[in-house]
């Protein structure tokens, strides 16, 4: 099956900074947000660019 979720939120954080944190730097961010649950992360494919 396919799960679809759509949401719209407002934030005082600039869109570019929010995108960078949530998608480009998520491997670093998730370790800081959930240090008790995430020991380490590793990008195994791709370089984040085109």
Swiss-Prot record:
The superkingdom listed in its UniProt entry is Eukaryota
Instruction: Cite the Gene3D superfamilies for this sequence.
Output: 3.30.530.20
Q: What sections of the protein cross the membrane?
A: none
Entry-linked SUPFAM superfamilies: Bet v1-like
**Which keywords accompany this UniProt record?**
Allergen, Pathogenesis-related protein, Plant defense
A molecular function annotated in GO for this UniProt entry is: signaling receptor activity
Among InterPro entries, the record links this protein to: Bet_v_I_allergen, Plant_def-hormone_signal, START-like_dom_sf
GO BP field: abscisic acid-activated signaling pathway; defense response
What's in the GO CC field? cytoplasm; nucleus
Q: Record's family? A: Belongs to the BetVI family.
> What is this protein's record name?
Major pollen allergen Que a 1
The scientific name of the source species is Quercus alba
Give the lineage. Answer: Eukaryota, Viridiplantae, Streptophyta, Embryophyta, Tracheophyta
């Amino acid at each position: 099956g396919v799960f679809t979720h759509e949401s719209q939120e407002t934030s005082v954080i600039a869109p570019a900074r929010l995108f960078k944190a949530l998608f480009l730097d998520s491997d670093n961010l998730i370790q800081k947000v959930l240090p008790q649950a995430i020991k380490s992360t590793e990008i195994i494919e791709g370089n984040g660019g085109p």
